[in-house]
Amino acid sequence: MQRIIKNNEVVDETWHLLPKDFNIDDISNCDDLIVPLQLWREHSRMLKARDGGLGVWLDADEEAEEIGDDVAEFQVIALNFPAFTDGRNYSNARLLRDRYGFKGELRAIGDVLRDQLFYMHRCGFDAFALRADKDPYEALESLKDFSVTYPAATDEPLPLFRRR
């Protein structure tokens, strides 16, 4: 079983992340699922009628605005980082938290590495599914890499000069 970082601790993964090519006929009624955006668009009524938990995941080329009106439907929103160098979903995280008021779990998935976690957390992420070859316990320490931050962000809306 995969382990993820959630709310500053390492826990067992309990959600099933469905791939983009998943067949909707194979969906369980009671499992907790994180579905790709396209599957949500095509089958939202059926997905909402299930008994299990519901989440959605966006790829880096998909926009937060596409689910802005639906965020209350999801317990989890996962944002995919296809490469360490692709930072587009940092912006989506800020939009989901600050503009759309998403209060559920915001999870980073894909090519997620230790060096990114502190900055992802500042943008509103509270869960991290690290790349399979990385140790979540070691990566957890990165959330304490810096004790003071200067600019405002989702995790601290006041810049340092306003906190005095």
Question: Model-found features: residue ranges?
Answer:
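A positional/architectural concept
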Residues: 10-58
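Active-site-adjacent beta->alpha loops and helix N-cap segments on the catalytic face
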Residues: 39-46, 84-96, 137-145
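Short beta-strand/loop segments at the ligand-binding rim of alpha/beta enzyme cores
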Residues: 49-56, 95-108
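Glycine/Thr-rich beta-alpha phosphate-binding loop at enzyme active sites
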Residues: 53-96
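Catalytic cores of alpha/beta
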Residues: 56, 65-69, 114-127
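Glycine-rich beta-to-alpha transition loops that act as phosphate-gripper elements at the mouths
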Residues: 60, 106-114
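Glycine-rich phosphate-binding active-site loops on the catalytic face of alpha/beta enzymes
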Residues: 125-143
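C-terminal helical cap(s) of enzyme catalytic domains, especially alpha/beta-barrels
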Residues: 137-164
